[in-house]
């Protein structure tokens, strides 16, 4: 731990000063992605410097075979819930109120955005302008953000079913329901699940195992920042494949261990988040796993707009502060150059964002 972090957090609760109970740990003998036993230490003495909840210090290993990263040892499934005491999906997000008076400029932006959403995803938002579907193509950064909010899903036909795994407080399912999907979710965190249920969403408290009987049932399944949290990602993707109808779509969004941010900020990169992030993929390892399980038409999406937020959070962590602090932060000339002058390849983006289809028989 850096001296800066020691000094800054001296007046805060420092849960890492206590060890995670030894009887609540499990060892990881082989890579959870490719089953290789060959590995090197990527980072050690990692702490929960994101939410300041979890005790213990942790070691992140890099698999020599597939370049994925994983914790060993790690909290076992029975105890991992202790690391989620103040997780950000416990509360309900703000709802857009189109009745609020805004400036003419912001009203036009909203009309154009709503016009694009209505055309592309099937929402019925008002006020809306049909020009939105054309103007959106001229603003690639904003288009990326809008498409990722709706997870690149097709416009649904009647009675198409969507499942969100790890749905949190239901923010995305509210959007998908508005677009015409028949939505449901599963969420292991009772606090987050109850927040979603209070919004009238069908959410089961637990894991995907609750839905084992619904083979070939869903037209789309989404996993946004979920797969890095599970102990057995391969089994999760196999279960998703069974639940999807032939030709059904899966959407995945997860941190990228090969990103520029991971290289620049190292143990303070926001995407590590020990001990909640158990496995961190790179694009090649995730795509290889999907192909082996039975997915096709894998399409990596470009979400470069997320870089600045990740860099700012990581810089705050580097300074020993919470990534969600409101204090201003200086990124430094090199990071600013990365943001303003570079257009990173998809394998260097902060997140792996992709869609794939279950192979049709």
What are these regions (language model features)?
Residues 2-30, 41, 45-53, 299-361:
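A C-terminal cap/extension of S-adenosyl-L-methionine-dependent methyltransferases
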Residues 3-8, 16-32, 38-39, 143-268, ...:
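Conserved SAM-binding loop
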Residues 5-110:
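N-terminal juxtadomain amphipathic helix
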Residues 65, 88, 256, 304, ...:
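Non-catalytic surface loops within mature trypsin-like serine protease
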Residues 67-179:
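Extended interfacial segments that mediate partner engagement and assembly in macromolecular machines
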Residues 70-72, 80, 172-173, 192, ...:
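Short catalytic/ligand-binding loop motif for oxyanion handling, primarily in non-cytosolic enzymes
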Residues 72-75, 227, 256, 304:
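Flexible, active-site-proximal loop/turn residues at the rims of small-molecule/cofactor binding pockets
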Residues 76, 189, 209, 303-304:
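Residue-level "edge-of-site" marker
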């Amino acid at each position: 731990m850096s001296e800066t972090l020691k000094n800054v957090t001296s007046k805060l609760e420092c849960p890492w000063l206590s060890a995670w109970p030894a009887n609540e740990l499990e060892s990881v003998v082989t890579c959870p992605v490719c089953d290789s036993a060959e590995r090197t230490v990527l980072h050690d003495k990692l702490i929960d410097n994101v939410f300041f909840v979890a005790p213990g210090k942790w070691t992140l290993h890099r698999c020599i075979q597939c370049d994925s990263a994983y914790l060993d040892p790690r909290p076992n499934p029975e105890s991992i819930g202790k690391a989620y005491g103040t997780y950000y999906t416990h509360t309900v997000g703000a709802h857009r109120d189109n009745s609020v008076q805004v400036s003419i400029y912001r009203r036009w932006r909203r009309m154009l955005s709503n016009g694009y959403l209505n055309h592309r995803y099937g929402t019925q938002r008002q006020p809306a302008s049909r020009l939105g579907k054309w103007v959106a193509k001229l603003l690639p950064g904003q288009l990326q953000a809008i498409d990722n909010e709706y997870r690149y899903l097709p416009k649904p036909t009647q009675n198409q079913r969507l499942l969100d795994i790890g749905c949190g407080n239901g923010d995305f399912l509210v959007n998908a329901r508005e677009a015409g999907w028949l939505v449901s979710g599963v969420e292991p965190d009772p606090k987050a699940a109850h927040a979603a249920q209070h919004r009238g969403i069908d959410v089961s408290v637990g894991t995907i195992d609750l839905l084992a009987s619904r083979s070939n049932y869903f037209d789309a399944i989404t996993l946004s920042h979920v797969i890095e949290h599970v102990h057995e990602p391969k089994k999760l993707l196999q279960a998703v494949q069974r639940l999807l109808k032939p030709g059904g779509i899966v959407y995945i969004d997860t941190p990228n261990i090969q990103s520029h941010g991971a290289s620049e900020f190292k143990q303070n990169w926001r995407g590590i988040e020990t001990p909640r992030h158990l496995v961190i993929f790179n694009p090649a390892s995730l795509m290889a796993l999907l192909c082996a399980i039975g997915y096709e038409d894998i399409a990596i999406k470009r979400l470069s707009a997320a870089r600045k937020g990740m860099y700012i959070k990581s810089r705050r962590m580097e300074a020993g502060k919470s990534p969600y602090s409101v204090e201003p932060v200086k990124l430094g000339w090199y990071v600013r150059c990365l943001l303003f002058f570079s257009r990173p390849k998809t394998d260097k983006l902060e997140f792996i964002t992709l869609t794939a289809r279950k192979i049709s028989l």
